Structures are given as C-alpha cells and as structure tokens.
C-alpha cells in the first residue's frame, strides 16, 4: 500500500472554465509527490514539493494566484507537519514569498518555534536566504477581478467566498511508514488585513501523527478552526473509523454545528486514503501503487497510470 500521496486543490465552487485546469494541477502535484516517494524521499519532502507546485500554479488560491485582502494585497498562510516527531512549522500573513510552504518547513527545521507571522516571518525568510518576490508577481488578473467584484455594494459574499476557497494541501506516507501533511492558502477574498485562518494552526489546517494518520483540509477557515477539523478527523480514526468514515463524520459535524462547508484529504498509517468534501466540489488526486486517482464532483473517481501525462 505504501507509498501514497493525496492532494487537494480546494473546496467550493470552481467555475466551469477553470475545472479542467484545476484537475490537471492536482494530478501533476500528486505525480510530483509520488515520484519523490518512489525515489525513497520522505513524506515531508513529498507534501512540501506537491504543495509548492500548486503554489506556483496561478489557478489555485496559494502562492501565485492567492486571493487579495480588503486592501488588494496578498497575505498567505502555510503549515507543514512531520508525523514522525510531531514537529511542525507554519507562517501566517506572510507577504512577497513565492512558496510559503517551503518557508514553513524552514520554521520547522531551523527554529524552536511552530509559527512565525507577518514581518517576523519576512525577517526570518531573509535570514534564510529566501528571496522576496514583487507582490505583483503573485497577483493574477482573476484575483483582481474577484477582489473588485466583492467590493461592489451588491456583492454576494457567500457566492464570492465559495468561488475561491482554493486552499491547497497534501498528505503522504513514505516507504518507511512516516507520515506528513502540508497546507497553503491565500485565505479569504477581501479579508481584513492581518486575518489569519485555519491553515497555519496545528490541528485545524492540518495534522500528522505516525500513530494515526494525516489530514489536510480546505473550506471556510473560521468554521474549520471552531471544530479543529483536522484533529477531529484523526480522533474518529483513533476510535476505529476508516479515513472515509472519519472524514464524513467530521465534515457532517462542522456543517451541523457551525454551518461550515469544506473538504479533507486523509491517509492512515497503513496507506488507506480518502478525499471527502461537503462543498459543491473539491479537486483532488491520489497516487498509489502506480495508479493516479482523481476527481472533482461528488461521486467522481477516475484512474489512470501515474506515468500517463495529459
């Protein structure tokens, strides 16, 4: 069953003209992570590189392509967690960084802290030799259009949010049985300056534990934080539920308790995986035993050989 990597490209409503690109993006990310695992790379390597690839893809709400805050600026959050040691690293409200997930990994590996935020994260990035990029390089025309649309007096905030909840994430188990997760996001459209969501919060925006499994979620950050969604999924798995059952229970609780929609990708320590969501759509892909699994709508489960490129 090992190794395995599962990725998501965000939950919500994906406009028709972007569905194919979103699916291609998650498939490529899963292939990238799986290739690392096949070469004997670690689960941490796999999830970080899979997520970094999606951060560079302007079709996702992470890195380049991130949504804009109320001032029209990009502020990003990211998390990495190593299930072997329970070490984690995160950055929040970080600016002008092309790959926040890689900076989060540096926080995990080079500091005694779990999370650095805003200017402190920027100073740390500079000390690590991580280059700053011009903010304009992270802003797409699509993000600008959504920002302007949401500023209009008659804007439907629910419609605008559901159209771009595209947090990206990955979970993996490597050949040694070690588990990891990574999540990255630009956050909510037109959020207040300095708003931080679930993504960089351990137990909310991700969790990994070799004894149980790993989760990376997507959806409405405030709802995910209220129910500590990632740890809730793993709690159900500790009680003997499968990854799929645990995901469905946790997502149903979030909907019932705080009216929150979202999705998760999950693995357990045996390599059993799930990609489940309560939102309209979630682009996801998984690679295991030479097969690439992927989908977008409820009920989707397509497969093709991992090495087959579209």
Swiss-Prot record:
Keyword Hydrolase: yes
A GO BP entry: asparagine catabolic process via L-aspartate
PTM text: Cleaved into an alpha and beta chain by autocatalysis; this activates the enzyme. The N-terminal residue of the beta subunit is responsible for the nucleophile hydrolase activity.
Record-linked CDD domains: ASRGL1_like (cd04702)
The enzyme's E.C. designation: 3.4.19.5, 3.5.1.1
Coiled-coil stretches: none
Keywords: Autocatalytic cleavage, Cytoplasm, Hydrolase, Protease
Top EC class, one word: hydrolase
Assembly description: Heterodimer of an alpha and beta chain produced by autocleavage.
Protein name: Isoaspartyl peptidase/L-asparaginase
Species name: Danio rerio (Zebrafish)
